[in-house]
Amino acid sequence: MRLQAVYLEWDDSEFHDTGWAAYDPRRKSMLVKTMGWLVGENARELTIASSCDMGEPPQWGAQFSIPKSAIRKRRRVTLP
């Protein structure tokens, strides 16, 4: 899977995070893995704010799937 670095804005906090997104053909969605643990008890929505330059994909952090269109359109996403 080709990775795309993304900048994430968590809508319920002052925190920002960076992460990697990759298209998952089985689910027809984007698999996102964050650098941090900002998907907490209250974090239910995020905005894919932009792409960014980063180094290696994270080895830890939160992981979830979102619709592929969310990254293209940079729209708000409600987490499952």
Identify what each model region corresponds to.
Residues 1-80:
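Conserved RNA-binding domains used in RNP assembly and mRNA/RNA metabolism
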